[in-house]
Regions:
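Glycan-recognition and catalytic cores of secretory/periplasmic carbohydrate-active enzymes
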Residues: 1-417
Length: 417
C-alpha cells in the first residue's frame, strides 16, 4: 500500500507490514460468520457460529462495515458478503409494518426482543453508507430506510442528540438517554456526510460532539457521564448494581474516553481553521489523558480496566479487547494531529500489549475479554462476535487521515492524501 505515515517515521514495528498482516487475518476469521439463512452469526472463541446466539442487528452491520471497507480498499473481494448482509437487513431485520429494524432475529427467523434501539440504527446507517460506496445492490434502499427511521424517531431536534430506545411500534419512547448511541451516531453521521455531502449529517455530528464534549465532559472534570434522564440530566448511579453491562456499564467507561477523543478529532477535520471549535482539540486531549491516567495499569496489572467510579477507582477490572483497540487509534490520531512523540510511544506500548496478550495466535481474531491477570474469560463478552474495533485499529494508520473510514478509503483509492 505504501501510504502509512508510521513506516516513514521508522519509530515503531507496528506499521504497515504488521497492520496489513493482522487485518487480513481478522477478515479471514470474520468470513466464518456467514450463515445460509441470512446474514451473519455470532462467532464463538474458535470462529464457529454459536448456534445458541441470535443474529444481532449490530453484528450484521459491523460485518458489512468490515467487509465493505476491505473490499473497497482492494484487500479482498467481499462483494457477495456485503450483499448477503444488506439483503438480510432489508428482508429479515427490517420491520415491514412499523419501519425500523429489529434488535435480533434467532436462527429460525423469530424476532427477539420488544424494543428498537438507536444503537442498532446508527450501525445500520454506517453499514448502508459503506455498502453504498461499495456499489452493492440494495444498499441505497437500506440507507434510505435507516435515514427515515433516524429522522422520524431517533433524532431529537430540541436537545440535538439521539434518542435511545422505542417499543416495537414506535409509539412509546423510553425515558433513558445514553452517550453510547450518540457516539456511534457521530461515527455514522460523519461517514454519511463523507459519502453524500448532505450538511444535515455534519450539523448533527457537530451538535452531538459539542454537547457531549464541551458540556457533559467539561462539566464533569472530563469524566464523561454515560447515562441520562429524558431531559439529559446525568444519572451517575445508573446500573450501579449491574456494573459490567455490555452497553450500559456503571460509571466512567475508559474505552469511550479514548473513542470520543478519536472521533471528535476526526470530525474536527471538517471544521479545521474555523473559529469556535477550539474545544475539540482541548477536549480530545483531556479525555485521552484521563483514560490513560486512570485506565492503564490502574490495578497494578498490564492493560486497561473496563470502568471506574466517580472517585477514579476501578470497578470492572476486565480487559476488553475493544478498549485497547480504541486506545491505539486515539494515540495515533493525536500523534498525527500534534506531532507529539509521546502519543506514538503510547501507540507502540499499547500495540505491544495487544500483540502479546490479546491477539489469539491459535484460533484467530482477538480475545474479547481478559481478567486482571490476563487470563481469557467470558464474563461480559462470550466468544468473538465481530472484528469491528480490531480491524479499525489496523486500518486507521494505513489510510489517509480523514473524518470517516469510508471517506479515507475513497480518498486512498483516488491516490490523494
Amino acid at each position: 500500500m505504501g501510504n502509512s505515515l508510521l513506516d516513514d517515521t521508522g519509530s515503531t514495528i507496528y506499521g504497515e507490514k504488521f497492520l496489513l498482516k493482522e487485518a487480513k487475518s481478522l477478515i479471514e476469521f470474520a468470513r466464518g460468520s456467514e450463515i445460509i439463512n441470512g446474514g451473519f452469526g455470532y462467532l464463538n472463541s474458535r470462529g464457529q457460529v454459536d448456534l445458541n446466539q441470535p443474529r444481532q442487528t449490530y453484528v450484521q452491520c459491523r460485518m458489512i462495515q468490515v467487509f465493505g471497507l476491505t473490499h473497497v480498499m482492494g484487500l479482498q473481494d467481499s462483494s457477495h458478503l456485503i450483499k448477503h448482509g444488506v439483503d438480510a437487513l432489508n428482508d429479515v431485520f427490517f420491520d415491514q409494518r412499523n419501519s425500523g429494524f429489529y434488535t435480533a432475529i434467532d436462527l429460525s427467523g423469530k424476532r427477539i426482543g420488544f424494543s428498537k434501539l438507536g444503537y442498532d440504527h446508527m450501525f445500520v446507517l454506517l453499514a448502508a453508507v459503506t455498502a453504498t460506496a461499495a456499489g452493492v445492490g440494495g444498499a441505497p434502499k437500506l440507507l434510505q430506510r435507516a435515514e427515515d427511521a433516524i429522522d422520524r424517531f431517533f433524532w431529537d431536534p430540541e436537545f440535538e442528540m439521539m434518542n435511545d430506545q422505542w417499543d416495537l411500534e414506535f409509539s412509546v419512547l423510553n425515558g433513558y438517554r445514553g452517550i453510547n448511541v450518540n457516539m456511534h451516531a457521530v461515527e455514522a453521521l460523519t461517514a454519511a456526510f463523507d459519502l453524500t455531502k448532505d450538511n444535515k449529517y455534519l450539523d448533527r455530528a457537530l451538535a452531538i460532539c459539542k454537547r457531549t464534549i464541551n458540556e457533559f465532559a467539561r462539566n464533569n472534570n472530563w469524566l464523561l457521564p454515560e447515562h441520562f434522564s429524558s431531559s439529559w440530566k446525568p444519572e451517575r448511579e445508573f446500573n450501579h448494581d449491574n456494573p459490567a453491562d455490555q452497553f450500559r456499564p456503571y460509571g466512567v467507561t475508559i474505552g469511550h474516553l479514548f473513542e470520543w477523543s478519536r472521533l471528535v478529532m476526526q470530525v474536527g477535520l471538517l471544521v479545521k481553521g474555523q473559529a469556535g471549535y477550539e474545544w475539540i482539540e482541548e477536549g480530545a486531549k483531556k479525555l485521552y489523558a484521563h483514560a490513560k491516567k486512570y485506565g492503564w495499569n490502574a490495578d497494578n496489572s498490564p492493560g486497561f480496566i473496563y470502568t471506574m467510579d466517580w472517585q477514579m477507582r476501578p470497578v470492572v477490572h476486565s480487559r476488553m479487547h475493544w478498549v485497547a483497540a480504541e486506545a491505539v487509534m486515539a494515540a495515533y490520531v493525536l500523534w498525527r494531529i500534534t506531532g507529539d512523540q509521546n502519543f506514538l510511544t503510547d501507540y507502540d506500548l499499547w500495540w505491544s500489549f495487544i500483540d502479546r496478550h490479546v491477539i489469539d495466535r491459535e484460533f484467530g481474531s482477538w480475545h474479547h475479554e481478559l481478567d486482571s491477570q490476563l487470563h481469557v474469560i467470558e464474563t461480559t463478552w462470550p466468544g468473538k462476535p465481530d472484528i469491528y474495533h480490531a480491524l479499525n485499529a489496523c486500518l486507521l494508520p494505513l489510510l489517509p487521515f480523514k473524518p470517516s473510514f469510508i471517506g479515507a478509503v475513497i480518498v486512498h483509492n483516488q491516490g490523494t492524501s
